[in-house]
Structures are given as structure tokens and as C-alpha cells.
Amino acid sequence: MKYLEIAVEVESCFTETVADIFWEFNTGGVSIEDPLLLWQYINAQIWDAYEFPDSVLKAERATVRAYFPLTENINTLLSQINERLKSLGIPFNLYFQEVDEESWANSWKKYFKPVEVGEFLIKPTWEKLPSGKEDKKIIEIDPGMAFGTGTHVTTALVLEALPKYVSPGKVVVDVGTGSGILAIASALLGAEKIYALDIDPVAVKVARENISINRLEDKITVIENDLLHGFNQTVDVIIANIIAAVIKELALDAYEKLATGGIFIGSGIIVEREKEVMDKLLEVGFKIIERKNSGGWCLLVARKE
């Protein structure tokens, strides 16, 4: 199916206004590329790591894109949107082009192939199981466009470490579960019960779908939750593949929710922040029992003594 992509360049302060106009015309989706907002986040060091093309970071104005089914009324639609934008009395540039649905809705799938990580094989639902891999613990996943494929080095570090710390009978919490991969992996290792927590309702929906695909609903409970706030069970293992700042915020709560001898696995930590995260874990009472670095990222495993 063909779509019309309409792109409007405006000053950053008008991006939400333009997006609202697109929604008025029943767009199928809106994206905003705002260099000013990106630089605010970068300069505030909210992200430990980021990767954006120079064309976005160095742009003088923001770009708001919207997608509409290509129909015979497209010229009327373009004219109406143009007039609506003019009525705002703000400077803007409008561009448009035809695109295939494949190019923006499904093209990412061609790059997501089965990947081995330690004892596991992560397989997208639309791919066949590679021959000779039947002995692997298979994680089937359909992350959708809202989430990564789970094969990032931070996830791989956790998957490689999990078999040492998750075993039959363990109770596990996966904080910031995202697509649910680490919760699923814990279930495949024999954990008795897993709680998959995420503050993002979209993540909760995606995680539940992936858990259903893997037929693990009886073992994994997905909860929309802010970190461990209000979670009052004592558990054996807590996993947090998030970022350094959040792991530091989580440290004391994780320590208190773990049984004696319990394990905390933290990933998503850039190597430059490894020491401060270690210091925080030690401060609240943990003992560091494993450290591993890969590709500029760090995994820390700590035990409650």
C-alpha cells in the first residue's frame, strides 16, 4: 500500500501544534525530529548514550512528519493542510512524497534475524528456527516498532549472566522489562515465578504479547509499575537493564526486596559510570560478585550478604 508522507519544517516551539493539525486530519502516524529538544536532553546528560544523524542534530528547525493513505483526494488534503498551517501565521516549509508502507512500517524486520546469545536463541516470530539450533532455549519475540529487538549488548550481557543466577524455584523481578526478553529467559531457566515491571503501558502490552507467544503466562506476571515502588514481595533475583542513574535510584529498594543471598543484576551502564554505580551498590550493603564490560557497556552483579 502506498502512503503520502507530509513533512513540515517549523520552529521547535510549534511542533506540537503542527502535530495536532495532522491528527485533526486523521493521520496514520506522526513523528517529530526536534534538534533543540534533543540537545536539551544531551546537555542535561539525561541519556548515557545516544546516536542521531548529523542531519537531525544540526538542523536549524524541527521537522514534523505525518502519513496518510494515498487516495484520489490527496491534492485536496494537501491544500487543506497547507491552508490550516497558513492560518497559524507562522513560518513553515511543507514537503511531501509517496512512500511504500514497507518503507516505514515493516522495513526494520528485514534486519532482525535469529541471534544466539549464550544458551539462548532470540527468534522473531516471522523467521524459521535455524537448523541445528533445537537445543537452544528459544525466545520468540515480536517487538513491534516501539521497541528494540532485544539483541543490544546490554541485553546480551544479562542473557549471558542469567544461567549462573537463575535456577528452578527462584522468584525473579525484571524491572523495566520492555519487550519481556529477560523475563522470558528467566522462565526458560526454570524460575518458579517472574514479575515483569514497566512504567510504560506500551511496554506492558508488548511484553504480555511476547509472553503469550512463548506460552509462559502461568509463570510471568506483567505489571505496569514505577520501578519497585509498591512492590512488597521478597524475591531471589532482581534484574534491571536500564541506565546508571535509574539503577542508583533503585539500589536501596532492590536491596530491601531481596532475600538474604539474593542477586541484583544491573546492566545498561556505560563504562564511564561503572564506578559510581558500584559505589552506590556497595553503599546500600551489596557485595559486587561479577563485573563484565562489552562495547562500552557494563554489567554488574551484586549479592545481598
From Swiss-Prot:
Enzymatic reactions: L-lysyl-[protein] + 3 S-adenosyl-L-methionine = N(6),N(6),N(6)-trimethyl-L-lysyl-[protein] + 3 S-adenosyl-L-homocysteine + 3 H(+)
Gene Ontology cellular-component annotations: cytoplasm
EC number: 2.1.1.-
Broad EC category: transferase
Subcellular localization(s) per the UniProt record: Cytoplasm
Segments traversing the membrane: none
Signal peptide: none
Gene Ontology biological-process annotations: methylation
InterPro entries reported for this sequence: Ribosomal_L11_MeTrfase_PrmA, Ribosomal_PrmA_MeTrfase, SAM-dependent_MTases_sf
Keywords: Cytoplasm, Methyltransferase, S-adenosyl-L-methionine, Transferase
Record: residues binding S-adenosyl-L-methionine: 155, 176, 198, 241
Record GO terms (molecular function): protein-lysine N-methyltransferase activity
Keyword Cytoplasm: yes
UniProt KW Cytoplasm keyword: yes
Annotated family: Belongs to the methyltransferase superfamily. PrmA family.
Annotated function: Methylates ribosomal protein L11.
Descriptive protein name: Ribosomal protein L11 methyltransferase
Species whose genome carries this gene: Carboxydothermus hydrogenoformans (strain ATCC BAA-161 / DSM 6008 / Z-2901)
